[in-house]
Amino acid sequence: WFGFGFFLSGLWWVGAAFLVEAESFAWLLPVGVLVFPAGLALFWAFGAALARLLWSDGWARLFAFAAAMTLAEWLRGTILTGFPWNAFGYSLAAQPLTMQLASVIGIWGLTLLAYLVFGAPVLFLGGLVSDRRSRLLSLAVIILMLLGAIGYGALRLNGAGGATVADVRLRLVQPALDQREKWQPGAAESIM
């Protein structure tokens, strides 16, 4: 259910596309808004089931969960031409310092790091890791990974100049277009 709720909240906007020509397509709205997120949630169900198979006692459980869920996200982004929309790693890509690591490990590496960082509090809950030393060591490893990502981001951004690149033409497109106007040949000039 968590996966369904996650994808439902991240894909609610898909339903708006069925309302452009509502007389023809509104009947498909439940498919886009309910069935599509439910199908995507199956990938997370697979990841959770795989994590359960890899379960072990102690801190390794968090790493098994993070690896299994990252694999599930990668499969979702790859199978049947893929749909990597709203991958968990995008939560780290919202910050310029942490997003720089994507240049090295990509979105799937950021996804693994996000699962580890955001899952770290579980090390202190429910007696998962009873040995205080192991708990602190595993938390230190995760914190060092995050600090390493931030440090790399700071170095990379510090080295980025604001230089102008010659012979580059940049075209900005207004994304908030009425869908009926979008394909009208006479609207091309105002859109572009």
What do these predicted regions represent?
Residues 153-192:
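Soluble catalytic regions of membrane-associated enzymes that act on cell-envelope
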